[in-house]
Amino acid sequence: MLREWDINDTAVPILSESELDEFQEWANGHCRFVYNAHNEDAKKHTSGWAMRNTNNHNVNILKKSCLGVLVCSVVCTLPNGAQINLRPAICDKARRKQQGKPCPNRNCSGRLEIRPCRGHCGYPVTHFWRHTDNGIFFQAKGVHDHAKPEAKNCRETRRCLGLGKRSRNLALMLARDNALNKKVS
């Protein structure tokens, strides 16, 4: 379906159930979706990207900006061949604390640093959300110029297991996770 509406339009289209989109956790690029008003992920404004609420002067539209990704300063490689792409904290203070911490790869002397998102004309990619009785309208502006961060549930799992305080354990957890995935495949 051709998406000719803009999130800022005074009136957005009314769509039938068959015209609604499947939820996209990793929306990337200039795109528009309309989700079912009862979709839990859409209601929570879920995204795989690390997004934080940013100032928007329209109270009917929620604006979120991408925070980028935490990477190793020496761009090391884990034993499984993957690179460090951690989810930055949403809170400014917590994000500042993340920077400069030792790389979770035990074989690396690098430090964690933020690779900011600059995929929208040099500015962070933005996601816009608007709730109507008919659906939840989503619009993204920009293309992420960095790798995907670890999934949010991975970070929460590490925290629940008590691994969040000792980032060195991340490499071990990633290696175990990779080995488990290989066994399942």
Predicted segments with their positions:
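N-terminal intrinsically disordered, charge-rich regulatory segments that carry short linear motifs
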Residues: 1-89
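Histidine (H) residue identity feature
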Residues: 30, 38, 45, 57, ...
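Core nucleic-acid recognition elements
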Residues: 43, 57-58, 65-75, 86-92, ...
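Cys/His-rich Zn2+-coordinating "finger/knuckle" modules used by eukaryotic regulatory proteins
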Residues: 87-143
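Eukaryotic transcription-regulatory low-complexity IDRs
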Residues: 124-125, 129-185
